[in-house]
Amino acid sequence: MNSLFLLQFACFIFMLINAFIVAVSYLHVRWENKRYERSRWMIVVALLGLAIQYVIQMGFGFRAADDSLGAVVNILVYTPCFSLISMGIYNIEATRSNLRKMIMMCSGIYAAIIAVFCVGIRLHHSLYIREGLYIMLALFCVSVIYCISMIIQEMIRRKNMLETMAATDLLPYVRYSRASVVILWLAVLAMPVAIFSTTLLYIVGPAVLLALLFFNLTFIALGSSYIPTEELLDKEVENDALVGTKYRYGGGTFCQTADLC
């Protein structure tokens, strides 16, 4: 039993424990928020997907056989998992229409990754797809950078809204926001390291796991600090977005004052 197998096994146990903690924390929330709960189960599914990936790596020995072979499997699994985590984060911040746009964009990028993978196998007749690996890595980085930019925009907008309209403690939200961005940036930085050197993975891997743990804890803390007034703000924002859309496309009426309505 070598050190790589032990690292993969530790990551597998870590993902299972974190998925269990995030799922079970549902029993300890004071107020239930449908948007937050959707995000919770997105993150749980993503963590379980990452755990399954480590089982595959241990069972078939892709990473042990070759760094590039293991990296191909990593990208195929990491992309949808990190997209799910990103959408779970974004779901708390954004309106439903914006979330649908993000889902379509992430799905399109992952479809492109699958297409590159299939073309690479067809050309090289093996999982060693050579230059296709770097195209897949580039697409993965594009996906994560896109998610980061969208999340940061919504976080700034929502923080300003909460400061203006809600007299609540913003510290849990600020911690959650920072942890969200940190875990996504580490995803961008860790993937090239995972491709070029398994040795460096022993250093970067624990750092990513600690960041993921901190994110999960701040996510749970955010749910524990939730109060119903925030859900009213969410509904108000969505209603404003819906009214703006109807007015823009002629699907509704626009009133200057309450008396005219």
Could you describe each region identified by the protein language model?
Residues 8-9, 66-70, 129-147:
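Alpha-helical transmembrane segments
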Residues 10-28, 38-61, 76-83, 108-119, ...:
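Hydrophobic alpha-helical transmembrane segments of multi-pass membrane proteins
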Residues 18-25, 81, 145-159:
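Membrane-water interface of transmembrane alpha-helices
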Residues 27-42, 65-67, 90-103, 126-129, ...:
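Membrane-interface helix-boundary motifs at transmembrane edges
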Residues 75-85, 197-222:
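Hydrophobic alpha-helical transmembrane segments and immediately flanking/interface helices
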Residues 90-119, 131-140, 165-183:
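The cytoplasmic-loop to transmembrane-helix boundary for the fourth helix
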Residues 218-261:
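Membrane-proximal linker segments that couple transmembrane helices to downstream signaling/catalytic modules
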